[in-house]
From Swiss-Prot:
NCBIfam families noted in UniProt: dapB
Sites where the protein binds (S)-2,3,4,5-tetrahydrodipicolinate: 159, 168-169
Annotated GO CC locations: cytosol
Protein name (record): 4-hydroxy-tetrahydrodipicolinate reductase
CDD domains cross-referenced by the UniProt entry: DHDPR_N
Record localization: Cytoplasm
UniProt entry tagged with the keyword Amino-acid biosynthesis: yes
Length: 269
């Protein structure tokens, strides 16, 4: 009989957490074995399905990650940077595949994942969808093909609850554009324009963040030159695309050598 991997969902009460719970329980390729929330949360001890307003799933929400991870083969984590760092160490201890969709992580926090990646598989991406990861590759190719006569701007829009800006996906796109041009994003990123800023610096990559309503996620990469413009665009209308990508990553990571991977590896792009 084929072994069916057990999955733990962190931040189970959140919008993404609930979508992940539904996606895992709807799949015949994995099984839900754990649902985590922070200590003191009113879901602790309740069946996660009932807490979500549905049928019982036989999995009680817990605030003990090590106990939950001990039963699992993978952890899917869309939480916050500090929480993700703690989960990474515990997931590595349990030898679980750790799928990280958490955004807003600093370079130092990303580097802090490396000790865990020496012992377990980490798959981390600012966006888990196939479409966005294709957009990243296209952005890199277009940036490499065009010279600095084409200004590059990354514009993203999300719901009004999102706490970080630019989005992780916008930064992925900016990194791809910078890589295509053979420069470091930190050297050319322009994240703040307000007031009398002067003319645009040639070669900069600009970022713009829109927050409003219930926008799931929209990303545009604009290449603008005198007389012509190219726009690469991705629109997500349902969080399920991120959940499906995360589940694909969790399955892909089974049996892989320890290391720090991304969705390009998972999708073979």
């Amino acid at each position: 009989m084929t072994h069916i991997p057990g999955i733990v969902i962190t931040g189970a009460s959140g919008r993404m957490g609930q979508m992940l719970v539904r996606t895992v329980t709807d799949s015949d390729k994995v099984r839900l074995v754990g649902a985590l929330e922070r200590p003191g949360h009113d879901w602790i001890g309740r069946d996660v399905g009932e807490a979500m307003g549905g049928q019982a799933l036989g999995v009680a929400v817990t605030d003990d990650p090590l106990e939950a991870f001990a039963q699992a083969q993978a952890v899917i984590d869309f939480t916050a940077p500090a929480a993700t760092l703690g989960f990474a160490a515990l997931a590595a201890q349990a030898r679980c595949v750790h799928v990280i969709g958490t955004t807003g992580m600093t370079a130092e926090q990303i580097a802090a994942l490396e000790p865990a990646a020496r012992h377990a598989v980490i798959v981390r991406a600012g966006n888990m969808s196939l479409g966005v990861n294709l957009l990243v590759q296209l952005t890199k190719k277009v940036a490499a093909a065009l010279d600095e006569d084409f200004d590059i701007e990354v514009i993203e829009a999300h719901h009004h609850h999102k706490v970080d800006a630019p989005s992780g996906t916008a930064l992925m796109l900016g990194e791809a554009a910078a890589e295509g041009r053979g420069v470091r994003l930190d050297d050319v990123a322009d994240r703040a324009r307000d007031g009398i800023t002067g003319a645009r610096t040639r070669g900069d990559i600009g970022f713009h963040a829109i927050r409003g309503g219930d926008i799931v996620g929209e990303h545009d990469v604009l290449f603008a030159a005198p007389g012509e413009r190219i726009v690469l665009r991705h629109v997500a209308s349902d969080r399920a695309v991120f959940a499906r990508g995360a589940l694909k990553a969790a399955l892909w990571g089974q049996g892989k050598a320890p290391g720090h991977y991304d969705m390009v590896d998972v999708l073979g792009l």
